[in-house]
């Protein structure tokens, strides 16, 4: 049964409020309409596009929290952060991030998302990657969304913070990395 425009827009607004990181494509499938219809509905309702919604949430929630680097230097969009505990970021694989011939994401972008998230999760003004162990488990293609999840695991025998980052595309592991983070409190004998 086809919904009226008013009913669809009301449901659309509610859906975006509940899940602000939902894409227009996902909304179009859910509401059985074209992507253009979703975009027109969003415009009429003054709901910004996904990237702007993400930036709004990230800026409002994390700008004062991230210490080790400016939020705009984190690769991907931070959507969850608890310093010295965990962090999550998302990155859409756009044409500028892939090889032109095969549309596969360049590995350094996947690494950069994970590494910058490992830096961002550290509760210190200075955090640097001292060492990392990485594994790419499958290629990532243009149009896919990478969700990176960082978890602080503890300290190594040199007092460096160990951050484990796992990156997923639709719940499939595509990258994993163990980052050994040096930070300025290491020098001061703190933490």
Curated annotation (Swiss-Prot):
Keyword Kinase recorded: no
UniProt keyword Repressor present: yes
The record's keywords, sorted A to Z, are: DNA-binding, Fatty acid biosynthesis, Fatty acid metabolism, Lipid biosynthesis, Lipid metabolism, Repressor, Transcription, Transcription regulation
Domain of life of the source: Bacteria
* Entries under Gene3D superfamilies matching the protein: Hotdog Thioesterase, Winged helix-like DNA-binding domain superfamily/Winged helix DNA-binding domain
MF GO annotations: DNA binding; DNA-binding transcription factor activity
Q: Report the leader peptide range.
A: none
Q: Which GO terms describe its biological process?
A: fatty acid biosynthetic process; negative regulation of DNA-templated transcription; negative regulation of fatty acid biosynthetic process
User: Sorted alphabetically, which HAMAP family does this protein's record hold?
Assistant: Transcrip_fact_FapR
* The protein, known as: Transcription factor FapR
